[in-house]
Amino acid sequence: MNNKKTATNRKGMIPNRLNKFSIRKYSVGTASILVGTTLIFGLSGHEAKAAEHTNGELNQSKNETTAPSENKTTEKVDSRQLKDNTQTATADQPKVTMSDSATVKETSSNMQSPQNATASQSTTQTSNVTTNDKSSTTYSNETDKSNLTQAKNVSTTPKTTTIKQRALNRMAVNTVAAPQQGTNVNDKVHFTNIDIAIDKGHVNKTTGNTEFWATSSDVLKLKANYTIDDSVKEGDTFTFKYGQYFRPGSVRLPSQTQNLYNAQGNIIAKGIYDSKTNTTTYTFTNYVDQYTNVSGSFEQVAFAKRENATTDKTAYKMEVTLGNDTYSKDVIVDYGNQKGQQLISSTNYINNEDLSRNMTVYVNQPKKTYTKETFVTNLTGYKFNPDAKNFKIYEVTDQNQFVDSFTPDTSKLKDVTGQFDVIYSNDNKTATVDLLNGQSSSDKQYIIQQVAYPDNSSTDNGKIDYTLETQNGKSSWSNSYSNVNGSSTANGDQKKYNLGDYVWEDTNKDGKQDANEKGIKGVYVILKDSNGKELDRTTTDENGKYQFTGLSNGTYSVEFSTPAGYTPTTANAGTDDAVDSDGLTTTGVIKDADNMTLDSGFYKTPKYSLGDYVWYDSNKDGKQDSTEKGIKGVKVTLQNEKGEVIGTTETDENGKYRFDNLDSGKYKVIFEKPAGLTQTGTNTTEDDKDADGGEVDVTITDHDDFTLDNGYYEEETSDSDSDSDSDSDSDSDSDSDSDSDSDSDSDSDSDSDSDSDSDSDSDSDSDSDSDSESDSDSDSDSDSDSDSDSDSDSDSDSDSDSDSDSDSDSDSDSDSDSDSDSDNDSDSDSDSDSDSDSDSDSDSDSDSDSDSDSDSDSDSDSDSDSDSDSDSDSDSDSDSDSDSDSDSDSDSDAGKHTPTKPMSTVKDQHKTAKALPETGSENNNSNNGTLFGGLFAALGSLLLFGRRKKQNK
């Protein structure tokens, strides 16, 4: 059986058949997962390394003291400067880089407008670094890392999950009890490949040595690899000891809290830095109880101790002891002090708590005489706090007090702050001091120290600018800052745990596992990490059990697929997590023990049916009546909520249809209108008796639905056929036989005048009026047959024998009038009113037959010795008038179709038997017969009267 679900089958049911479901099963090999854990083994997760950049513009033509010019160092020389100031800034000034979480770059610029003399010095100083993992996570010094691990370990499970803890081989008590004070395990933490490196670094072109330029973006980085013995337990300690010239941090002082983190932000060891002893003591957390074979590497930002390493271009022994492993390296330090500059500044340190900049400014190191000397400080992103009274002005009494590290021993300086007025302006962002203080001239030298506090309302990166305005012009110096990160890694073989439990059939749908309820085999279960990444998948066994193995402590997500034919039961029913259902998706937390409480329950999904009836609504009222029948063969389509066709069927001989094996949900039923039928009215009465229309939306909720009906009626058609057939036949036959034999010796004068008038008038009138008005179906057949037969027979027999010797004068006047009048009037009126289809056929057949037979036989025998003069004049007038009038009026008023077929036909039923040869139009047939009949009758009469006249004589 193929259990693979395609994208198509996944969307809906198979049309018009029972949907059968089988539980799918994947055979998945369970693989043990060895999780490599990344550790951040660094110092002071709360500290940011600061790199200081200083740029100065001087009023000297040349500066004999070498100054760093490779990195952000420029010097402009004023042509009006005295020739003794011929020092040129070189590229031998230092730049220091330290791998703390932030490097603050300070740039100092000293400008003198008239002279255009510029010297640029870049100084990078670093504070303590926050150790980062391989994912480059940065922890700033100001962040309290002590709460980070707690936040990471908070379970995201939406309900309380009971976890069965497994006792460990060691430290089992420590997993539930407060950590006990451990012992120093410096001998169990082993460091190799220790190095103190200068990040970036600058090469002295004269000596070829790489130097650490503390104020030019260089940083120092302490690097090492390490391993931790498995015997180390929570609460044990180890130390980092820094030497006389080396400390953690950067320009920013190291914070007291120095924690070590792993890649996920979990605390491995908590460190406390003691600035007096320059030592950090670390205490292991229970991380070491959860992992074995822990090893790693780290990179930590560090900085020269400015109060001890005070002189530029001097190699200091940077020494550190990690655990019991000691390492030292000579590092040449240069802070970039330019003794010929009349104005130069540097950041002494950045306070770790409030991030204030503690600045040191050297004024008039060359000891020149000024007649004008105004010192101005402009802050960007910072503010002064006049109430703090930390703007100090010291008078230098010994040239050696200008130490290169900008960290003078102020106890040996003369504090003259009270002699000057510091004028604050620009919302305490500008401070101005007149260093002449009313004197006409002065060559005094000053060291000015001030504190600049971050301006929280500012969005600028921050900058501190200094200006010294003298009679020779302006000199300026600028300090700016940027961040630099350190990093570290660590890994170990983590202790492994299991997660899983059970998928069961909840037959009573109460959301709880009962003793008689069984597991469901073949349910897919997917395991994901807290970020939603799939880690593994498996399938429940024949008992409904599943398990994921080889898992580390952490938060996981478990997803259950709904087996075919089932519905998820109620989740989190009751208070016992061990026997309830956790739903389709749940969260499980592993914390030093297996978690076998993640269950899910399902019950078999009941199947439902829908359908009913399609009927012929003969009275078009939209309601099913007892006399109305179903319509067979109507196509019905079923769609799911997505509009996908999931079934088609046709109504049976009773108009019934049905769809089965349906889940609860939304569907659409579509009826296809049969040809020749019209949709009846919808929703006219009760739902189980009315019509629902061509498309019906229906929702099945735990029940069948057999109320989905539809009705149709026949389309309106009227057919009216009116046929009128009128046949008029007039047959007039006149036969005249005259035989005259005259023998006369004398004189006979015979005058015969025959006037025969035959008038045949046949009038056939057929009037058919068919009026049909129908709404439905009416078949009306009207047939009118009218047959009129007129037979007129006139027989005249005349025999005349005349024998005369004398004059015979015969005057015969024969008047034969044959009048045949046939009047046939057929009136057919058919009125049909039907509801649907009206077919009116009116057939009117009128047959008029007129037969006129006139027979005249005249025999005249005349014998005369005399003169016989016979004059026969025959005038025969035969008038036959046949009038056939057929009037068919068909009026049909119907809703659909009304064909009207009028037809009028005159039929000659006797034409074959009796008709004379045609000598004219068909209407003159009877007239010709009458004419000849009259002529023969007249001739006969003439002979008859001739004979009589002869006899009379």
From Swiss-Prot:
Q: Alphabetically, which GO biological process terms does the record hold? A: cell adhesion
Instruction: Spell out the InterPro entries in the cross-references.
Output: Adhesin_Fg-bd_dom_2 (IPR011266), Adhesion_dom_sf (IPR008966), Fibrogen-bd_dom1 (IPR011252), Ig-like_fold (IPR013783), LPXTG_anchor (IPR019931), SDr-like (IPR050972), Sdr_B (IPR033764), SDR_Ig (IPR041171)
Which is a Pfam family this sequence falls into? SdrD_B
Per the record, its GO cellular-component terms are: extracellular region
Q: Where is this region: Disordered?
A: 51-160, 678-933
Bias (Acidic residues): 685-695, 712-892
Please indicate the residue ranges that the annotation assigns to the motif LPXTG sorting signal.
Answer: 916-920
Role of this protein: Cell surface-associated calcium-binding protein which plays an important role in adhesion and pathogenesis. Mediates interactions with components of the extracellular matrix such as host NRXN1 to promote bacterial adhesion.
This protein is called Serine-aspartate repeat-containing protein C
Tell me the name of the encoding gene. sdrC
